[in-house]
Amino acid sequence: PISAQKDSRSIYLNTKDKGIEISPTFSGIFFEDINNSLDGGICAQLIQNFSFQQYMVPEAPAKEFSQADSIIFGWSVISKGDAKGKAITTNEKPLLENLPRYYDFDPNDRYNDELRYQQYSIRFDIENAGDGFGLAANGYGISEHGSERAGHYYSNNTQIPSIAVNRGISYDLSLYLQGADYDGRISIYLEDAQGKVNSETIVIENLKNSWTKHTATLKAERTADCRLAIVADKAGTFYLDFVTLMPEASELWMEGKAGPFRKDLMQALADLNPTFMRFPGGCASEGTNYFGQVFWKNSVGDVEQRIGFRNHWGYWTSQYVGFYEYLLMAESLGATPLPVLNNGVTCQFAGHQYVAPLDTEEDRKRFYDIFVKDALDFIEFCNGDTNTEWGALRAEMGHPEPFNLKYLGIGNENKGEAFWERFDIMYNAIKEKYPEIIIVSTAGSASDGKEFNDNYAQIDEKYPDTYVDEHYYKNDNWFYNNRDRYNADKVRGGQGIKYDRERPTRVFVGEFANNATNNAYASTLAEAAYYTSLEQNSDMVVMAAYAPLFCKKGFNKWNSNLIWFDNRGLWRTTNYYYMKLFSKAGNRAFAASNVMNGDQIDEHVYVSPTIDTESGEIYLKLVNSEAVEKSLEINLDNRNIYKVLMEYISSEDTTVKNQGAQNYYSSYPGIVNFNYNETITPQSVGFGPVKKNFNISIPGNSVCVIKLIPEE
């Protein structure tokens, strides 16, 4: 690790001349339900369309939904021998007599919102049971015969067994049944793609004439991709609803105590050491139409009463994971929550934009109830005493302590008079009741230009105490060439105004990524170089997050994502690994430091030195964007003795991607020799003790963190 003097560079670290304080919330994550990240992803519940709500939307046919009552999305009919019968979707037997209706939806929206309050179940009408008649839940998968574009759960490509079970692991089953004139038995079991039973068989009989919840445990006999079979053995009629299957606690994040989350995906997030978590969008929180917005009250309380919806990205969000679970998720990661609420303006880039009317007194009352009061109630849900309405619900759900919400986003990539008029109403109402809440505003969808300038003009005049959410998806050159974007002397946008540290306005880089090369290693080098400048300007940029966070293999709406996964495993991109390396940070930067090549600055080495003022540990984050190895002489201004640990990633080939070679995922038919290998992973080297000056080799095309640990 100690290099000879070849192609040498040097850096001087003045440990006495401290620079800015690093924002304690600087490095975070942004979770959005995009790329099928939630249901069938980070949510460990294994049954797709478990409440049978994915039904046709009249006047807006979408292939992500069943198009007829006999086509049950994500399920297949089982008909053995000479069995004859029907299984159809119906709303004649609602599971809940008093389904909460928190919102008086706008009757002028093009979608019939009344339908979203319908409670569907399955009615079995069996003429002849033969050797068995029933349904099988296929889970979250995609068929080799699916003809539609990748990324959509269409009814004709969800018909293969895709419930990934592991030998010896138990799975907790829950379902509701109601009899009519059925007096037979119902058998429930796991079976693989060859029809071979893969668990014990649970038998339910003597059905009651009212909804009854049944629970059981199924232990997998083999590791396989399965379906859940529910099979009747006699003629008659009965009803089925709300079928869920959850892996045992050992397979869940924190054994299920922090929500129904997949352990492997959550561990990947925990390893990033996020300081904040933004959720649930993004465009997902705006929606493409009125009902497609995220309404938080529809996502809390008992899971049976939650109302799913077709999200902005064109598929179903069940809300099995709702705002309460998001808050638990953030808390379990040690991350400050940053939820985003809509203000009555849906995505302004979608085909059908909705703007909540304010023309009449009735309009203004509806706007207050659905958007303004809703935001105030949400803050009460997060922070309120248990004797308040929404604080009591939080306690009832299992969290009597407040979540200590500090930040709240209003809108996403919005712009224009309609947005700012509604933003103003919500901003003033929140600040009047909860002045301590920091509101996150928006610079729009672009990193510069008219929209960016117009939004900042509104913020400068009326909302200078907000954090401004800036988004940009750019190429390698942009990230290399804009490292000075937030420097104190840099002019912001086209208004001739600087990022003024004397004003309270701060920047939240809520979404950024190099999307030109789709997670190729070259994108990592450019992003990491840029990220060093964000950290060195974190007196202005107080939060930053890559986006998107997750993508399910074969279901990508976006081509550059931090973590790729399937039903069994995951791939961490090199973009992920540089963020993991860079999450190791001190709490204060050094005064400006450069890597020198003689008396010239090396323009291809990017650096951010920080120090932990309590432990004295020094962190030198460094990117070498050239293919040549460099010997770096590190000069310290003190005589302390240090141990040295360098962690790094590097690659001669900058086109490499840690996404796996396969097009889809482990359960896709015909896949052989499937693996979760990652081509590039962090390496480490340590040595010492060192004092004053020492040399270390920096690999070509590398992202490094050099940690200096004081010796006692």
Tell where the protein language model's regions lie, with residue ranges:
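C-terminal beta-sandwich/jelly-roll accessory domains of carbohydrate-active enzymes
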Residues: 625-712
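Active-site groove signature of glycoside hydrolases
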Residues: 232-233, 247, 280-283, 343-344, ...
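Extracellular and organelle-lumenal recognition/adhesion modules and their flexible linkers in secreted
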Residues: 3-318, 336, 353-369, 417, ...
